[in-house]
Amino acid sequence: MGLLTVLKKLKQKEKELRILMLGLDNAGKTTILKKFNGEDISTISPTLGFNIQTLMYKEYKLNIWDIGGQKTLRSYWRNYYEENDAVIWVIDSSDIRRIDDCKFELKKLLEEEKFAGASFLVFANKQDLDGAMTSEEISKYLDLEQLNTHHWEIMSCSAVTGLGLEEGIDWVVKDIVSRCFVLD
């Protein structure tokens, strides 16, 4: 293998990003990925364990790990904490009764040293439903303004309509690239 081939492989590897997608069960993590990938979203079942979706976005290969959010699976989340460039936390904006549970799990997640420096996107999902909290309300309730350990953004979205999905992924990729790569 020649030096040029090795350099090309290294360059391709640089353009590969690992993103961890977490949130409580029924937040819409799998639906977001399927919608973004142009797949059918009419029959989604709960994720038992994890799914890995590889998406091409601009010139980047995104390996997105979608981890089930059921209470019985949350203790296993830490098995996926290594070497992530970003975390996407998905919230069901219409499920006000579980916002305290969401805040508790998010706080534990943000205390993990393995995520230090990772880009952090909160998708305020299900904005298409009546009574959904706004991204501003969620940000305030979750105290995101106090978050100074990560680059972060909150984005309103709907996995059903596609609202905000591309903008969110675009922010994640740009934030990772601005921190990790020297632009050509």
From Swiss-Prot:
Pfam families: Arf
PROSITE patterns: ARF (PS51417)
Binding locations of GTP: 23-30, 66-70, 125-128
Disulfide bonds: none
GO cellular component: cytoplasm; microtubule cytoskeleton
Keywords: GTP-binding, Lipoprotein, Myristate, Nucleotide-binding, Protein transport, Transport
An example Gene Ontology biological process: protein transport
Alphabetized GO MF terms: GTP binding; GTPase activity
Lipid-binding residues (covalent, N-myristoyl glycine): G2
UniProt cross-references to InterPro entries, sorted A to Z: ARL2/3, P-loop_NTPase, Small_GTP-bd, Small_GTPase_ARF/SAR
Homology family: Belongs to the small GTPase superfamily. Arf family.
Summary of the function given for this chain in its UniProt record: May be involved in trafficking events within the endosomal system.
Official protein name in the record: ADP-ribosylation factor-like protein 2
Gene from which this protein is expressed: arl2
